[in-house]
């Protein structure tokens, strides 16, 4: 092989490697990641870890855990008792210290349905709106179980936050639990590590996932992302989709904001044309976001939620 041919071959390898590294998707297959790699722990900094697990229909639910001298803090669980039990077992491979704090980043079941596996003496940090939602969910679950099966257990934290910020000293590492406003739900909480400059955003940040708006506040949500982007953060961690390297994490959060604004604007445009929700779903042009994960499931829900906002059904 000539020297020129060798350089061409090397260049092609580099280009192909860069192309593979640049795949940005919530789909593990598109990233070339086998499902057998999950669940997996992603080290974010000393004593700070992300936890990625696969849920149906084949994308990640992300949790955060932080290890201090006095114990472990977890932000968001997984979507079933079995999945949360596995998460706790994986955490014990990193630290045998007790899990003492749990932050309800999202009150949705795909993050809370396994909370019955948490230690009984754990301290919950939850927004009042999310606690109220969990009370409602608990009542509903107790009366709507399947015939012959025990009702689903919804854990309701005993008390809620009394302000929009709570600082927790884990021993050698400090976290701030923040409410930046209504976004994916009415009570989204984020976990900020000021020394490490990491912000776990829970479901307020869905990396390459079509904006899921079942309980969302569309206009408020974009403002929350703006507040997060204005913070002293080098790495943003999503509640779904993949954990990215620092620079990419910011780029992808900005991309998600673009998606959120575009989806909301398209739903408003269709509403302005006088289209029914059903006709709007058929007529919608989502542009590049039509190919984002869950677009086929979440597009109609987004239209319904924006229509609810415009027609005064969301307060």
Regions of interest found by a model, annotated:
Residues 272-315:
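C-terminal regulatory/interaction regions
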Residues 222-275, 279:
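Divalent-metal (often Zn2+) His-rich catalytic cores of metallo-beta-lactamase-fold enzymes
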Residues 19-21:
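Boundary at the C-terminal end of the N-terminal hydrophobic targeting segment
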Residues 5-17:
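Bacterial N-terminal signal peptides
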Residues 43, 164-193:
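Core dinuclear metal-dependent hydrolase active-site scaffold
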Residues 75-77, 100-108, 125-129, 180, ...:
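Active-site neighborhood of phospho(di)ester-bond hydrolases with catalytic His/Asp-centered motifs
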Residues 89-167:
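Active-site HxH/HxHxD metal-binding segment of metal-dependent hydrolases
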């Amino acid at each position: 092989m000539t020297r020129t041919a060798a350089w061409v071959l090397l260049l092609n390898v580099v280009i192909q490697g860069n192309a593979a590294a640049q795949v940005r998707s919530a789909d593990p297959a598109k990233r070339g990641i086998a499902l057998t790699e999950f669940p997996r722990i992603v080290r974010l900094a000393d004593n700070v870890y992300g936890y990625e697990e696969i849920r149906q229909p084949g994308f990640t639910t992300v949790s955060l855990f932080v290890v201090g001298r006095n114990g472990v803090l977890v932000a968001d669980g997984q979507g079933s008792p079995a999945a949360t039990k596995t998460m706790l077992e994986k955490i014990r491979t990193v630290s045998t210290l007790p899990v003492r704090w749990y932050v309800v980043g999202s009150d949705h079941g795909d993050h809370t349905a396994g909370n019955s596996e948490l230690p009984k003496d754990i301290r919950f940090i939850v927004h009042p709106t999310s606690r109220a939602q969990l009370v409602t969910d608990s009542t509903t679950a107790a009366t709507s179980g399947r015939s012959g099966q025990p009702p689903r257990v919804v854990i309701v934290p005993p008390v809620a936050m009394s302000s929009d910020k709570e600082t927790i000293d884990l021993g050698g590492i400090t976290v701030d639990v923040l409410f930046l406003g209504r976004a994916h739900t009415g009570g989204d909480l984020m976990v900020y590590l000021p020394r490490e400059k990491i912000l776990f955003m829970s479901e307020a940040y869905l990396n390459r996932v079509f904006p899921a708006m079942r309980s969302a506040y569309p206009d408020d949500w974009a403002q929350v992302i703006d507040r997060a982007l204005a913070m002293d953060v080098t790495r943003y961690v999503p509640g779904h989709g993949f954990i990215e390297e620092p620079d990419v994490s910011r780029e992808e959060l900005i991309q998600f904001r673009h998606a959120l604004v575009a989806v909301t604007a398209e739903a408003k445009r269709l509403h302005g044309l006088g289209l029914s929700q059903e006709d709007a779903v058929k007529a919608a042009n989502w542009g590049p976001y039509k190919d984002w994960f869950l677009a086929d499931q979440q597009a109609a829900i987004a239209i319904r939620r924006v229509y609810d906002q415009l027609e005064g059904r969301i307060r």
